[in-house]
């Protein structure tokens, strides 16, 4: 219940700050933000992936010291000082992590990945539009 209350508060705050912005782009952004708030709530409530995660398929994380990960929340899969990115990206460690992500073995509300995950998931579009209309 506390998560639900907080989610509603976040949505109201976003709406307040964006209410003077009336371009179509602004309305789409507001719809996406509303959808993402609902997505975070559902993810935390169900403790599982709600939409597919693209980490490891179109994303990579490179840390200043050269470590590479598929996501900031997953273990490092290699280091650019030791191997090139192609070798790291195609490594068995990377493939294992991709399989686990695809199977839904990890779930999160990662603010950097979730917007792209939602945009690349067409079944989410009706809910994004509903959030646009509500606002």
Predicted regions span which residues?
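Radical SAM enzyme [4Fe-4S]-AdoMet core and its adjacent flexible, acidic
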Residues: 1-55, 61-64, 68-69, 75, ...
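Flexible mid-to-C-terminal extensions adjoining Fe-S/redox cofactors in radical SAM and related proteins
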Residues: 48-50, 67-135
């Amino acid at each position: 219940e506390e998560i639900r209350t907080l989610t509603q508060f976040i949505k109201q705050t976003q709406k307040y700050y964006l209410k003077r912005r009336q371009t179509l782009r602004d309305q789409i952004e507001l719809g996406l933000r509303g959808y993402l708030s609902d997505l975070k709530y559902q993810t935390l409530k169900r403790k599982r992936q709600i939409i597919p995660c693209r980490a490891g398929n179109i994303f990579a994380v490179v840390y200043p010291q050269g470590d590479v990960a598929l996501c900031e929340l997953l273990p490092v899969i290699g280091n650019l000082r030791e191997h090139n990115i192609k070798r790291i990206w195609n490594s068995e460690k990377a493939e294992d992590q991709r399989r686990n992500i695809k199977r839904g073995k990890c779930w999160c509300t990662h603010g950097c990945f979730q917007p792209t995950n939602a945009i690349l998931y067409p079944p989410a579009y009706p809910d994004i539009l509903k959030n646009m209309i509500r606002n």
